[in-house]
Regions:
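Metal-ion/cofactor- or nucleotide/acyl-coenzyme-handling active-site neighborhoods
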Residues: 1-237
């Protein structure tokens, strides 16, 4: 599915699940991206990216109507109810067939496809990733976007009060609100910074006041912030 009608020069505002996540309002000045269940913090989501199929049942019918695109592995994780391993009979077509028609579907592949001998399509984009946020960056970069602002990407871990995870070792059956793998977030952060640096892209990690939301006014305060030599900046308002 082509994204040719999107302006690749626009920023993409990515909402992650960390404590600094904030509600993002719709505006024509930027696109929005969510991972796992963070579309619940976005007025209208342009790009929803998941590695784990278990999250597809977690958004309301009303929220799904406010999502324009979903990108996910050809063989998603956490679909068999036992563990995170992808399953041949539960590919992206099987788990997305219940989504409303307004959501355009974009498959890619990740490192677990060959690891578990999945019959994956080598013509699809292929990424080595360790998180849905990293998948989001890599997929959007592959599609031509290069300017990013993130909310809720917290290297020290934790979840926003509205967010949760479904541990892959439990097959997605258990919902938790206290992360059990906080040290991993530092690794994920460094991987994502490397992705941006290698692509020659830009990433502003924003931290807003607790009761605020992200809108066009906030965007204009942040978008021109100076970047370091790797294309990265952190802004606290």
């Amino acid at each position: 599915m082509s994204l040719d009608n999107y302006d690749k020069d626009k920023f993409v505002v990515l909402v992650c699940a960390g404590p600094s996540a904030r509600f993002v309002k719709k505006t024509d000045e930027y696109y929005t991206a969510g991972v796992n269940v963070t579309p619940n913090l976005i007025e209208e989501t342009d790009f929803w990216v998941v590695n784990d199929g278990c999250y597809l049942v977690d958004l309301s019918d009303e929220k799904l109507l406010k999502i324009n695109n979903i990108a996910l592995p050809q063989f998603p994780h956490t679909v068999n109810g036992v563990d995170y391993r992808p399953t041949v009979g539960l590919d992206y077509l099987a788990i997305t067939k219940y989504l409303p028609s307004n959501i355009k579907i974009h498959p890619f592949n990740i490192h677990t496809a060959p690891k578990f001998n999945m019959p994956y399509n080598t013509d699809l984009p292929y990424f080595d990733v360790r998180s849905s946020s990293e998948s989001c960056f890599k997929w959007l970069l592959h599609k031509g976007f290069t300017k990013f602002i993130s909310l809720g990407h917290d290297p020290s871990g934790g979840y926003h009060s509205s967010q949760y995870s479904r541990p892959t070792k439990e097959g997605g059956r258990v919902m938790i609100t206290a992360p059990i793998d906080n040290p991993r977030y530092h690794i994920v952060h460094q991987r994502m910074r490397s992705v941006i640096k290698e692509a020659g892209a830009s990433w502003i990690r924003a931290v807003l006041p607790p009761d605020s939301s992200f809108d066009e006014e906030m965007f204009n305060k942040i978008k021109d912030h100076a970047l370091d030599e790797t294309g990265y900046a952190e802004v606290t308002l």
